[in-house]
């Protein structure tokens, strides 16, 4: 079998994150992700988000500025939705139900008028890592890449951030995200847990006040709070 190697200098990810994740990019599981990705592309299978946006969460959120991690599951699988940021959709795209509930909670919590745009890039640029546990999906097939190995990659990121940083906020919404709590050192970081914001989930997200709690914690550890208004 032909050996697959990865030239990390060609991976579209900022230098700070590239160095931070260098070891992960060389591990066997990541080589398998690359192999499956290339096989799908060669079969003309449509994958979301586009290749240049797969690592968008890292490219918009500088490693040295990271303050908050909001963990999603996998990208939106309909056309023009996925942009490499958990829960976010590009400007002029209809706001999905889960994001609608996030905006409702922002209004309840901080009196922020619900945004007309679902693009959360302004959060990312302030240090909010909008990380999906699975970073790609086949068009129209939810969770279709759940067996590729992406979870090992995102778990490694969470664990490494927990070990090497201090004073971070991890927002874990829904049982899938809550299961990642074991990767996080709760003596160094704030872990905020709630139900998933999806309207299909049981009640428990609306009223969680995670956005104000996160900002209070950031101020307590000497960091600038997040401006949650969508720009």
Swiss-Prot record:
Family: Belongs to the uracil-DNA glycosylase (UDG) superfamily. UNG family.
InterPro entries the record matches: UDG_fam1, Ura-DNA_Glyclase_AS, Uracil-DNA_glycosylase-like, Uracil-DNA_glycosylase-like_sf
GO CC entries: cytoplasm
Keyword Ribosomal protein attributed: no
EC number(s) per entry: 3.2.2.27
One of the GO biological process terms: base-excision repair, AP site formation via deaminated base removal
Enzyme class: hydrolase
GO molecular function: uracil DNA N-glycosylase activity
Function: Excises uracil residues from the DNA which can arise as a result of misincorporation of dUMP residues by DNA polymerase or due to deamination of cytosine.
Pfam families, A to Z: UDG
Domain of life from the UniProt record: Bacteria
PROSITE patterns (UniProt xref): U_DNA_GLYCOSYLASE (PS00130)
Keywords: Cytoplasm, DNA damage, DNA repair, Hydrolase
Full protein name: Uracil-DNA glycosylase
Localization: Cytoplasm
Organism annotation: Campylobacter jejuni (strain RM1221)
Gene from which the chain derives: ung
Disulphide linkage map: none
CDD domains membership: UDG-F1-like
Active-site residues, record numbering mapped to chain: 74 (proton acceptor)
Catalytic activity: Hydrolyzes single-stranded DNA or mismatched double-stranded DNA and polynucleotides, releasing free uracil
